[in-house]
């Protein structure tokens, strides 16, 4: 009977019937086994996992895909919220700040908020209000810092004066004196130069001739020839590079008498105070000499205050009179004679 029924059906119905039977068989064979244990209804388990990790999908099994996505894992990672941090940073800044940095940070924060979209604005409305409050306080702090910076720049700079270098002043004075002398002498010696030029033109050539008679007499004696040349070189080298003519670059040679004369005549020192410079066993360096001269100048420049017992704020007026000892003795003797 079954066979008759199947053959009595139209060919289209037969095809649909066979497909339905095959689907039932495939549904029965679809099973999942984990650790050799079969799991019933795996579709329900998958739905429950999606509800746990992505509750907004509810019963749908659609995976959200964002732009510029490279893998499926990125759809399950929660989106990072970029909070603006310039409000917190302004609380830890110093009083003096540069206004340009604040403007750049505000521009960057505005662009980042615009690119994030409407969902970011709806989720973080409270954060926007907090950031606007922080921004207003930040602008007020920047205005105060700009005002303090302008006041500091407008105030006159403090000038620190270093101690005077007397030796350097003496050397400069000496150079100026030499330059003035050379300029005055150059103007007066114009005619002398013309005369010297004429003399040089009329001069004959001068040459030194060395006598090598003892060496020429025996041309095979090379030892004496070499010794003679070596001795001449030694003498020339010794004259140029003798210890007397050698002066280090850091050393300065001073004429003590000329230096004392400069200090007395030009700077107003007392010659009696400068006697220590004439000592033969003076082991002072240039720095120590300048210290002593500064001490003498300060002692001379500070006015001497003599107290005569004037009125003070916390004391009664007093009058101090200095009387010599013999006058005191005479006054005491006269008082005894008059009273006795």
Swiss-Prot record:
- What topology in the membrane does the UniProt record assign? Lipid-anchor; GPI-anchor
Instruction: Describe how expression is induced or repressed.
Output: Up-regulated upon milbemycins A3 oxim derivative (A3Ox) treatment.
Please list which residues make up the signal peptide.
1-29
Q: Where is the composition biased (Basic and acidic residues)?
A: 192-202
Which positions are glycosylated? 127, 270
Q: Where are the GPI-anchor amidated asparagine lipid anchors?
A: 314
Q: Which UniProt keywords apply?
A: Cell membrane, Glycoprotein, GPI-anchor, Lipoprotein, Membrane, Secreted, Signal
Q: Name the lineage.
A: Eukaryota, Fungi, Dikarya, Ascomycota, Saccharomycotina
Chain coiled-coil ranges:
none
Q: What is its main location?
A: membrane
* Pro-peptide region(s): 315-340
Per the record, where are the segments of Low complexity compositional bias?
Answer: 99-115, 182-191
Entry's Gene Ontology cellular component terms? extracellular region; plasma membrane; side of membrane
Q: Where is this region: Disordered?
A: 99-154, 181-212
Primary gene name: PGA46
Q: Which domain of life is it from?
A: Eukaryota
Compartment list: Cell membrane; Secreted
Name of this chain's protein: Predicted GPI-anchored protein 46
